[in-house]
């Protein structure tokens, strides 16, 4: 075969994939952020596209800003603006230059210096404009001002300043990233634990390059067992009769002709000649540096990088985190591949971030009947089966396959692991045994030493055991050892062994005291720290050992410190549901009262709450949260929600429902609705909005569940909850009544509407309110029900349904003015009501008031009503001031489009809507609003954003052989006529007339683009 052809590159990839075996599963592709790294390393089209988009956004943000165009209107010093404009022009030119395909290094340090200078001016401008804003407010004329007012102009400039700072930060982040270093160094070392997906990632990227007709080479480290010169060993493995220098010259020449870097990948260098790699590593990299058309990606399993890569090597290291933050995508893909039912809850154990673990989990169920698969998944989802049982199942199933292939009885491997290996590792007390000791264990059972050796290799290759290296004491020479592949399983199986051998259930206290029993684990803080995983595993197993008559904490000779509390919390998710008892509840309650670990344990409780049959299910969480005063709940629960990110149980639950609401059964939906309801207390707008929409999704499938929970939310002392529950219910009613199903309209909607009327609008209503949004949602639900049966309410009751209302909610409003002393005590950002809300939002409730007219008596009364109400709700500046200052500061520095509200603002919004309803009832709202004020918070119809249809499939840039000048001159001009009128669009019949659309195509490698 001719070398360095597309066919040759493909054959080398196929050979590597075959050798990789089960480590590469092409159909199990999960899109991960780390893919971006390889685009930068190889300078693919995606790399140039990313820089193009960044440059376009940067230039647009600056060129279209009021700050650039009209800075003189606010007397901003021209010396500041001239310097800033010059710096921005330099940065725009820099990004434009980066978009030109090149092999050369890009000087990312230069723009970082310019950004630093520009940022100082942006910070100065922000202070300058804030001061101008303050002076305008103090000197505001109560007479009507033309729009835009001076204050409006300042606000527009401030918004521009914030937006420009964000785009500067984005450019700074890009230029200062490891990716920038990698694209210039043309080399990267990918590190990660066993099974994390390094081989899959590298094979997949190489596959993508070759599919795109870009040369790339991958070699597996296991093929390089004897290395004198790493580069020459690679050439030899590729079966080439070339010197390493000739090999690199040929590849570099191809890269130059194509104007495209060629990537050489060596996967798992730890599986080859580690000493050879270590000795030849620096020479290998320095040789490659001479060939600008070539980039290199190496991977190594941790901790073997310590003995394979020189300590002083300056190669950029990056860590593969597996499916972290993408577990839900992975779970959906893998369950489909292995034909398993999708669990009805997100499995929140971090072990599922490991691709190999997820694969082994799926394989352990693969051979079961459909009925058994469903039963197993249901047992895990419902809480009947703990995570430790899952680990055992994986090991048992995998062990049976290995045993069968060697002619042993099915349980041979399981007995070997839980008895022999667990015993030896437990006796060692450090989580491992020497490789030679592992061989001795097998030699006892397998008399043929060759067969015993093969059997050990099988246990390692099938991931039941893992090879590792350790350094003992001051020794500089590592020892080869064997440990269990998964730390959780290792801890669990050793803990079980210790509890059998060293624990006396008739005298638990002495078992934890005596050093020759289990006391050595607790003899001091150092011992506790070093054995954290093992202690956690013993905690998980302990209740079952004493017939659920206590927790390990009840028998310990030492005080329960933070370390032990954290182990207890971490173990809760892993436990069998039957091991939860009254003592568990007591310790959970105790930890919840301590602030240090509250967020951590609440996240575990949220995860457990998804499991219907678990003792700590959603009903229990519901009962717990109902008992709080609103302000206490905000400090305790809403603060937990504020700190949660995409890896938390809370966000994963929302994500799960957004993706899979149609696959969730009624039993689980009931739990989800209850949990989501409590997410609505949050001041994080993103979480609150997504949770409301998730409730709507579930409600469309199970309207009765949502409606019942909506009615029960009226009992909750936080209107943030019931307002959004009614919003989601109203959305469901709008969606389902339109379908015209009598079962829904008669059997579900009508009874719901009747209960709403009795609870909110009747003369004896217990939950009447002036909250204008919630009241409107409730009224519109009833009015839709009346469309289908106008007689289910009496005429007299229909009158009570229409505004203005005489009853319900607060009818006698107090007034409290914020004292001057309180105002002085406000830290930056800590006031409950900031200027925009105070002037614009509250001002909208008062007719004939001009902006900044703070002396308007009716306006002053409304403000006093709102302050009176927020204090009645439990707001206190003293308890929320530090948190609200922190939120204000975070919002200023955050890139998030949807911000987090301060708690003061939350209480102000509730009071605002209640005052608005009261003023509506008394005819005091501005007439221009009609029956609906502009501050409607969320669209209760929950529309899906319109999809962009891609109708042009023709590649107008396919003639890449012509020089650019000829291509521009000779065309051809793209023909758009066929797309102006279509007989069919997607699956929808036409005719369809094009009103608006565009065609944008780029080929950045060949420096061509078109837009029509």
What are these regions (language model features)?
Residues 1-82, 86, 207, 306-308, ...:
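Extended hydrophobic
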């Amino acid at each position: 075969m001719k070398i360095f052809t597309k066919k040759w590159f493909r054959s080398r990839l196929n050979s590597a994939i075959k050798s990789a075996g089960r480590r590469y599963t092409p159909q199990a592709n999960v899109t991960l952020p780390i893919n971006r790294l390889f685009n930068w390393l190889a300078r693919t089209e995606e790399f140039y596209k990313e820089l193009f988009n960044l440059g376009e956004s940067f230039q647009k943000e600056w060129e279209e800003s009021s700050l650039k165009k009209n800075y003189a209107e606010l007397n901003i010093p021209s010396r500041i603006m001239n310097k800033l404009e010059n710096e921005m022009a330099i940065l725009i030119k820099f990004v434009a230059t980066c978009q030109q395909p090149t092999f050369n290094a890009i000087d990312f340090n230069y723009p970082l210096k310019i950004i630093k200078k520009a940022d100082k001016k942006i910070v100065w401008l922000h202070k300058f404009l804030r001061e101008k804003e303050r002076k305008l407010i103090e000197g505001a004329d109560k007479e009507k001002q033309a729009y835009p007012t001076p204050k409006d102009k300042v606000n527009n400039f401030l918004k521009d300043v914030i937006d420009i700072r964000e785009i500067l930060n984005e450019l700074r982040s890009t230029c200062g990233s490891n990716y920038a270093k990698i694209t210039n160094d043309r080399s990267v070392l990918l590190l990660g634990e066993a099974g994390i997906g390094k081989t899959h990632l590298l094979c997949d990227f190489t596959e993508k390059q070759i599919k795109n007709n870009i040369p790339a080479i991958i070699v597996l480290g296991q093929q390089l067992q004897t290395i004198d010169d790493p580069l020459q060993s690679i050439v030899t493995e590729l079966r080439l009769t070339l010197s390493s220098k000739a090999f690199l010259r040929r590849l570099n020449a191809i890269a130059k002709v194509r104007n495209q870097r060629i990537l050489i990948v060596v996967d798992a260098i730890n599986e080859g000649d580690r000493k050879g790699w270590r000795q030849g590593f620096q020479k290998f990299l320095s040789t490659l540096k001479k060939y600008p058309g070539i980039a290199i990606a190496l991977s190594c399993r941790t901790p073997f990088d310590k003995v394979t890569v020189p300590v002083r090597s300056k190669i950029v290291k990056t860590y593969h985190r597996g499916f972290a933050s993408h577990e839900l995508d992975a779970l959906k893909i893998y369950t489909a591949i292995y034909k398993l039912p999708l669990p009805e809850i997100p499995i929140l154990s971090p072990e599922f971030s490991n691709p190999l673990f997820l694969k082994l989990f799926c394989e352990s169920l693969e051979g079961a009947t459909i009925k058994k698969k469903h039963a197993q998944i249901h047992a895990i989802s419902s809480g009947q089966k703990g995570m430790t049982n899952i680990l055992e199942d994986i090991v048992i199933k995998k062990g049976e396959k290995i045993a069968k292939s060697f002619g042993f009885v099915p349980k041979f491997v399981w007995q070997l692991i839980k008895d022999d290996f667990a015993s030896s590792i437990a006796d060692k007390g450090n989580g491992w045994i020497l490789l030679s000791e592992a061989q001795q264990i097998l030699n006892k059972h397998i008399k043929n030493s060759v067969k015993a050796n093969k059997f050990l290799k099988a246990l390692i290759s099938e991931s039941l055991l893992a090879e590792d290296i350790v350094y003992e004491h001051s020794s500089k020479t590592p020892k080869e050892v064997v440990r269990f592949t998964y730390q959780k399983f290792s801890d669990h199986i050793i803990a079980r062994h210790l509890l059998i051998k060293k624990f006396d259930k008739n005298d638990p206290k002495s078992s934890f005291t005596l050093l020759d029993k289990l006391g050595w684990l607790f003899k001091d803080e150092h011992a506790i720290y070093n054995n954290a995983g093992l202690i956690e595993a013993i905690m998980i197993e302990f209740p079952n050992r004493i017939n659920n008559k206590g927790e390990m904490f009840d028998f310990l000779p030492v005080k329960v410190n933070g370390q032990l509390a954290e182990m207890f919390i971490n173990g809760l998710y892993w436990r069998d549901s039957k091991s939860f008892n009254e003592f568990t509840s007591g310790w959970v309650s105790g930890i919840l009262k301590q602030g240090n670990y509250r967020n951590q344990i609440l996240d575990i409780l949220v995860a457990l709450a998804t499991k219907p049959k678990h003792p700590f299910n959603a009903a229990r969480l519901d009962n717990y949260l109902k008992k709080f005063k609103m302000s206490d709940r905000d400090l305790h629960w809403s603060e937990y929600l504020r700190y949660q990110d995409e890896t938390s149980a809370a966000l994963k639950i929302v994500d799960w429902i957004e993706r899979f609401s149609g696959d969730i059964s009624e039993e689980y939906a009931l739990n989800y609705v209850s949990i989501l309801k409590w997410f609505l207390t949050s001041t994080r707008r993103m979480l609150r909005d997504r949770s409301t929409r998730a409730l709507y999704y579930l409600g469309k499938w199970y309207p009765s569940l949502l409606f019942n929970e909506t009615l029960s939310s009226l009992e909750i002392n936080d209107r943030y909850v019931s307002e959004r529950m009614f919003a989601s219910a109203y959305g469901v009613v709008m969606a389902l009544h339109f379908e015209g199903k009598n079962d829904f309209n008669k059997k579900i909607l009508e009874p719901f509407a009747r209960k709403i009327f009795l609870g909110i609008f009747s003369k004896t209503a217990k939950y009447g309110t002036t909250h204008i949004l919630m009241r409107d949602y409730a009224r519109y639900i009833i009015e839709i029900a009346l469309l289908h049966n106008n007689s289910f309410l009496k005429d007299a009751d229909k009158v009570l349904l229409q505004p203005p209302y005489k009853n319900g909610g607060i009818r006698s409003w107090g007034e409290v003015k914020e004292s001057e002393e309180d105002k002085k005590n406000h830290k930056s950002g800590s006031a409950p009501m900031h200027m925009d809300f105070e002037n614009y939002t509250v001002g909208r409730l008062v007719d004939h008031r001009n902006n900044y007219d703070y002396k308007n008596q009716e306006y002053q009364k409304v403000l006093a009503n709102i302050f009176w109400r927020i204090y009645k709700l439990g707001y206190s500046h003293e308890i929320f001031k530090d948190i609200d200052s922190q939120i204000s500061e975070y919002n200023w520095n955050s890139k998030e489009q949807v911000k987090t509200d301060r708690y003061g603002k939350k209480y102000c919004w509730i009071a605002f809507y209640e005052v608005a309803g009261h003023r509506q009832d008394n005819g005091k709202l501005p007439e221009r609003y009609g029956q609906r004020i502009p501050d409607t918070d969320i669209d209760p119809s929950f529309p899906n954003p319109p999809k962009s249809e891609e109708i042009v499939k023709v590649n107008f840039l396919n003639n890449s052989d012509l020089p650019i000048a000829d291509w521009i001159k000779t065309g051809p001009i793209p023909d758009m006529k066929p797309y102006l009128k279509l007989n069919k669009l997607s699956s929808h019949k036409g005719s369809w007339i094009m009103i608006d659309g565009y065609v944008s195509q780029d080929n950045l490698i060949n420096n061509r683009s078109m837009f029509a």
